[in-house]
């Protein structure tokens, strides 16, 4: 790996930068509309050469001097669209008029938001229709004002029409900003000459509110796009979960077009004082009578918190901190739960789980665009959605984050089951699998919380198992069919279902209580009356169905990585038998929802295991145990599955942190200096707060290093590489010929390489290299020889040397 400096946060302000967020000096005039992002400019009306200045409660084009101009911070809301943020921390905006102000007040009120949730947004649509109909007659767009809050009336689209010449359009009203008599700013249907503007670099802008990253130093990147990578992997993340379960369960979101002040706010139904937050109390072990503080940005007195499970923990700047700290790959699992969505009274989205998958896939591409917009244009952002291992390797070697899409739902591909009758066919599975592949999905689980037409589920233990069993009944018409496992099944077991007389205060660590399932129990107020089960250990009779076996084989054919987590023990065993028989390496156990018999089989197949992150002490112990399962034929790398935003608690503070604390600042991956993370007025400390939000994962890894030394960190830095090599084999690339069970390459095979081939073409032709250093690959050949393929600066094969 070569350390290069890329877009670092300097200690002082860069001229023309509102917040010292960018290190590359800006040109006096932006080269295109994307270059405006994060910059500080004077806005000049080219028809009069006058700059925008303040005038009463608005702005006019009123001065020929840049020194007198209002310094405007351009805050990107999407590619080419901006909030124009003034020195008084206000916005250049169109007046919303009398009706518009009433509509805004109604929709933003607690009552308005709750009614909107209960009616799935139909009341909001009706109110908007009234505003759109009556707005123009009551002042909507009648003036350009200094708006107090960001809104669609302050969200401007910038287009370049000539060199140094731009138009400013308000998409909400489909009108252009123009300059009239006396420099008055008006809206017009056409831009014309009076609607042409230029932007001149200046300083003095107000700082737009934002979460701090708190990481300094170089970003580790590769010397070439195709060499071996280093970096951490999280194979189980739910970044788009703000849209799941109807879209009203989680409070906050990973980004908002209008910034952190809109993204990190509590839910309206948590007011007043958190007393309405029943689900939060259930999931996080609180008391709805006592409530909780609801302040979000900038004080965060209660949330984010490692065990506050209805509040956002994966804001994009927190993810940026994790990326700067060494995260180079993660799988965002598109997630939903029909049962809980049907029960929860507030919603804005469909409860169909596959509708949720489609919506969240759309949203994550919107986030990619948003980060691109902050970074200077299309493709410039550090957050890159990838669909094959070659693309992912290139992204990581560029020093960016490779994002894989996956699915974790109970009724995957709409393949539910009712009274043992499946609701899908093999043909429908094929068609729907093609659809999600087209969405970019490359990693999938077959089940989540309930049996479906593909597989039985492992179930939950303890009191939570009672409610998930009830949920299974409501979703499938059948209780979980558990029986005592046969002795020969050994440790291949499901979670033991308790009978009613078993509920005698068994610790949650034994009952296996799960936040999502507990939410269903408390939200319904039902304990259920489940069957009387025989003695444990329990095994779900429902194993892998013929439809499930068909789907796994189709996933293998399409190169989709299979995750056995949440399947019943017998289904997992049968699934891994298929993986073995098909010699399919595309398997990952992403977050510890399998059993101890499965993890060695995953690694033996050439797959990857990324256990549930949780507390650093427990994770260290898991690493020490699982490392013994490593198969020497494959690169061993270790990752984690955070399950963040998926109703899974993050790691709390280590109990003995006071005796052996993480000390700040510390040196992270690639020589970075990692300080305590600051979000508004709140400063976080891993020793006190645990993993309160995703930005504290670099701190968590440092905590691991304190316990396990450099060895555990080294294995985790190989996590992304191990996954990439597994992914290559998943899509049909032949294994490394240096393996003892793989035939060495012949002269004829190596001779089939042609000058000018790309690294991808070389690998597709003769298989995985044994080493990938800088611009050269090595391969094992017959006769104990080594072939070295060398590439030029453009990434094309120039020579193959055999020695």
Where are the predicted features?
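Secretory targeting and sorting signals
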Residues: 1-23
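Lectin-like carbohydrate-binding module/patch detector with strong preference for beta-trefoil
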Residues: 4-5, 21-209
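N-terminal helix-cap/turn-to-beta initiation motif at the start of protein domains
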Residues: 31-42, 223-227, 750-755
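Extracytoplasmic
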Residues: 38, 227-230, 234, 774, ...
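A mature extracytoplasmic/lumenal domain signature
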Residues: 47, 56-58, 78, 88, ...
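Long, charged/polar, surface-exposed segments that mediate recognition or autoinhibition
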Residues: 89-105, 154, 744-755, 761-763, ...
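Extended, charged catalytic domains and RNA/DNA-binding interfaces, predominantly
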Residues: 192, 201-739
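A cross-family detector of function-defining hotspots
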Residues: 741-743, 755-803
């Amino acid at each position: 790996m070569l350390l290069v400096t890329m877009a670092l946060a300097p200690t002082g302000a860069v001229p023309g930068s509102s917040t010292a967020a960018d290190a590359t000096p800006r040109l006096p005039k932006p080269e295109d509309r994307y270059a405006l992002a994060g910059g500080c400019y004077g806005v000049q009306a080219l028809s009069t050469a006058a700059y925008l200045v303040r005038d009463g409660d608005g702005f006019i084009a009123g001065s020929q001097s840049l020194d007198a101009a209002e310094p405007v911070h351009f805050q990107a809301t999407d590619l080419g669209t901006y909030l124009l943020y003034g020195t008084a921390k206000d916005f250049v905006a169109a007046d919303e008029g009398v009706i518009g102000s009433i509509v805004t007040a109604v929709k933003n009120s607690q009552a308005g938001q709750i009614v909107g949730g209960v009616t799935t947004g139909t009341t909001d649509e009706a109110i908007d229709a009234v505003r759109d109909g009556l707005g123009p007659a009551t002042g909507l767009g009648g003036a350009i004002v200094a708006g107090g809050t960001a809104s669609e009336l302050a969200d401007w689209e910038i287009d370049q029409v000539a060199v140094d010449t731009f138009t400013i359009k308000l998409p909400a009203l489909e009108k252009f900003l123009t300059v009239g008599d006396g420099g008055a700013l008006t809206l017009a249907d056409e831009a014309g000459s009076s609607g042409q503007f230029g932007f001149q670099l200046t300083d003095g802008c107000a700082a737009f509110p934002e979460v701090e990253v708190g990481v300094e130093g170089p970003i580790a990147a590769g010397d070439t796009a195709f060499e071996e990578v280093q970096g951490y992997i999280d194979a189980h993340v739910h970044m788009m979960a703000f849209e799941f379960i109807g879209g009203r369960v989680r409070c906050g979101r990973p980004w908002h077009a209008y910034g952190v002040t809109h993204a990190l706010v509590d839910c309206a139904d948590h007011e007043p004082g958190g007393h309405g937050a029943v689900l939060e109390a259930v999931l996080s072990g609180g008391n709805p009578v006592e409530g909780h503080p609801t302040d979000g940005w900038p004080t965060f007195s209660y949330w984010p918190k490692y065990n506050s499970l209805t509040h956002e923990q994966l804001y994009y700047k927190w993810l940026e901190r994790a990326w700067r700290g060494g995260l180079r790959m993660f799988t965002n699992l598109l997630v939903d739960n029909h049962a809980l969505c049907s029960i929860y009274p507030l919603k804005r989205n469909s409860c169909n789980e596959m509708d949720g998958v489609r919506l969240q896939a759309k949203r994550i591409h919107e986030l990619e665009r948003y980060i691109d917009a902050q970074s200077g244009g299309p493709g410039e952002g550090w957050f890159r959605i990838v669909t094959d291992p070659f693309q992912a390797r290139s992204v990581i070697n560029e020093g960016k984050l490779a994002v894989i899409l996956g699915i974790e739902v109970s009724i995957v591909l709409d393949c539910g089951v009712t009274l043992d009758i499946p609701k899908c066919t093999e043909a429908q599975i094929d068609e729907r699998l093609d659809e999600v592949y087209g969405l970019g999905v490359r990693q999938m689980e077959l089940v989540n919380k309930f049996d479906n037409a593909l597989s039985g589920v492992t179930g939950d233990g303890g009191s939570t198992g009672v409610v998930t069993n009830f949920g299974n009944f409501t979703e499938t018409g059948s209780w979980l069919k558990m029986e005592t496992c046969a002795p020969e099944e050994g440790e291949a077991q499901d979670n033991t279902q308790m009978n009613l007389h078993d509920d005698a205060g068994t610790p949650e660590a034994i009952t296996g209580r799960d936040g999502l399932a507990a939410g269903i129990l408390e939200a319904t107020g039902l304990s259920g009356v489940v069957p009387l089960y025989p003695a444990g250990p329990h095994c779900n009779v429902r194993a892998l169905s013929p439809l499930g076996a068909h789907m796994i084989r189709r996933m293998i054919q399409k190169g989709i990585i299979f995750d056995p987590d949440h399947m019943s023990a017998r289904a997992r065993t049968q699934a891994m038998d298929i993986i073995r028989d098909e010699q399919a390496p595309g398997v990952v156990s992403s977050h510890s929802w399998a059993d101890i018999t499965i993890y060695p089989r995953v690694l033996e197949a050439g797959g990857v295991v990324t256990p549930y992150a949780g507390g650093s002490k427990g994770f260290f112990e898991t690493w020490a145990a699982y490392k013994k399962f490593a198969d020497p034929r494959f690169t061993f790398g270790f990752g984690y599955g955070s399950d963040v935003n998926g109703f899974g608690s993050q790691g709390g503070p280590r109990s003995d942190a006071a005796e052996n604390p993480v000390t700040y600042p510390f040196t992270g991956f690639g020589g970075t200096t990692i300080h305590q993370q600051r979000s508004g007025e709140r400063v976080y400390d891993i020793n006190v707060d645990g993993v309160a939000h995703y930005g504290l994962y670099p701190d968590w890894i440092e905590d691991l290093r304190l316990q396990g030394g450099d060895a555990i960190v080294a294995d985790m830095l190989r996590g992304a590489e191990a996954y990439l090599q597994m992914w290559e084999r998943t899509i049909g690339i032949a294994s490394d010929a240096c393996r003892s069970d793989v035939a060495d390459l012949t002269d004829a095979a190596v001779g089939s390489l042609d000058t000018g081939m790309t690294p991808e073409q070389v690998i597709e032709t003769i298989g995985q290299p044994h080493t990938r250093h800088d611009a050269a690959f090595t391969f094992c050949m017959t006769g104990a020889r080594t072939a070295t393929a060398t590439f030029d600066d453009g990434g094309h094969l120039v020579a193959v040397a055999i020695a």
